[in-house]
Amino acid sequence: MTRPLLSLRIDLPQGRIGPGKIALLEAIAREGSISAAGRALGMSYRRAWDLVDALNRIAGTPVVVASPGGARGGGASLTEAGRGLVADYRAIEQAADMAAEDRLAMLAARLTR
């Protein structure tokens, strides 16, 4: 049996950060634009932009910097705050996964009996 996976959601007074928002930031870093990141994740540009806006509000500072489109095309990239947010989230996720490893194995064994 495959090991159960732990999914991390962090509830802050300003809002919630979870795997979907972090995946969007990673896709923006990889794709170089909000619209391409949204397409890669199967979401509309509007939904992607709304999530970026929410992350900017949660962080209290821009996590994505976007340049307008046009003939030369636009683009987007993560700010230092955005890169830090992704790194912190992934580090917390890894620590939580390691801390829960034994209990997840016990849960899996209990559920397969």
Which residues does each predicted region cover?
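Alpha-helical DNA-recognition elements
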Residues: 54
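Short helix-boundary/capping micro-motifs
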Residues: 28-39
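Basic, amphipathic "hinge/linker" alpha-helix immediately C-terminal to the N-terminal HTH DNA-binding motif
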Residues: 66-89
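Short, Lys/Arg-enriched N-terminal segment that forms or immediately precedes the first helix
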Residues: 1-13
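Alpha-helical linker/hinge and terminal dimerization helices associated
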Residues: 88-107
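Residue cluster at the C-terminal edge of the helix-turn-helix DNA-binding motif
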Residues: 57-62
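Short alpha-helical elements of helix-turn-helix
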Residues: 15-25, 46-49
